[in-house]
Structures are given as C-alpha cells and as structure tokens.
C-alpha cells in the first residue's frame, strides 16, 4: 500500500510540474518541444554559439540542445558504435522522427545524462538532459514525446 501511495504522489508531482509548459524552438528552427516552465533559459557563452540551454532548481534536471558538427556520423552507425562500446543506445521513432536515444555519464561532473540525436535536413541536432532522479529521467521522455514540426 505504501508503494502505491508513493507512486501516486510521485506521479501527481511529475504531472503537476509538467503541466505548465513552454514551447522551445530547437536549433535550425524546424522542430519544437514543450518543456516545463520550471526550466529557465540560460544564455549561452559567446564560445558556445548555437547552444540553447535551460536549467532548473526544482526539477532536478537541466537540458541543452545544439546543432552537431557537419561530419556527424549517420545515426544508425552511431547507435551501433555506442552499443558496441557498452552504451545503452537505441534507435527510436517519436512522432515520425527517427532519433538515437542513449544514456551516458557526463565526463566533466559524473552526472547521468540522456542524449537524443536526430536529423534536421542534413544537420544533426543533439539534445542532452542531465538529471538527478529517475522521475527527472522519465520527464525527458515526456518532453521528447512533444517534438513536432514548428508551424509558426
């Protein structure tokens, strides 16, 4: 019974924090996602041109998105290489968009991270979510399930 109540409380908190959302245009402008209002825009440093970062003190997660380098490998090849290296990686289709989803540990601070990579024309777009709890990790999936073409 305790587990059921804990699950219910966590679910309510998760959905209440995700209820108020803002739409964010991803790099290159073709796609958008909805992120919780608790994620606040963090201006990029001049050297980080192209990076869009959002941080939160309450959600126990941060995220950034950016266009990858021109010579980024084909997603399927990259998924196979990551899997061969022991990384939890898979190809997934979300709202008609094929993307690579993988879990890594940030080398700089040891934080767990979920990465998403997908093609926007000839450009690869990378999105990384750093998270501190499983609830925050689950929220990344909810956020990515909102991806859609930018119709504005």
Segments the model singles out, each with a brief description of its role:
Residues 79-122, 130:
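Signature of long, low-cysteine stretches enriched in small and polar/charged residues
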Residues 34-38, 55-59, 95-97, 117-125:
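Short, solvent-exposed coil/turn segments at beta-strand boundaries
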Residues 2-10:
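Sec-dependent signal peptide recognition
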Residues 27-74, 104-110:
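Secretory pathway targeting signatures of secreted, lumenal, and periplasmic proteins
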Residues 31, 37-40, 127-152:
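Surface-exposed amphipathic alpha-helical segments
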Residues 9, 13-17:
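Hydrophobic core
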Residues 20-23, 48-50, 94-103:
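Short, hydrophobic/aromatic-rich segments at coil-to-beta transitions
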Residues 37-46, 81-93, 150:
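Short secondary-structure junctions
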């Amino acid at each position: 019974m305790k587990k059921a109540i804990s699950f219910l409380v966590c679910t309510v908190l998760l959905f209440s924090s995700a209820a108020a959302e803002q739409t964010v245009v991803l790099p290159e402008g073709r796609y958008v996602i909805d992120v919780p209002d608790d994620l606040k825009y963090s201006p990029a440093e001049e050297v980080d041109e192209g990076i869009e970062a959002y941080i939160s003190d309450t959600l126990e997660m941060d995220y950034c998105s950016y266009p990858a380098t021109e010579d980024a490998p084909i997603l399927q090849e990259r998924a196979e290489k990551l899997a061969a290296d022991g990384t939890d990686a898979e190809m997934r289709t979300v709202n008609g968009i094929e993307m690579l989803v993988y879990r890594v540990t940030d080398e700089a601070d040891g934080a767990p991270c979920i990465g998403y990579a997908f093609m926007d024309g000839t450009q690869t777009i990378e999105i990384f979510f750093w998270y501190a709890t499983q609830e925050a990790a689950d929220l990344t999936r909810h956020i990515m399930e909102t991806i859609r073409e930018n119709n504005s």
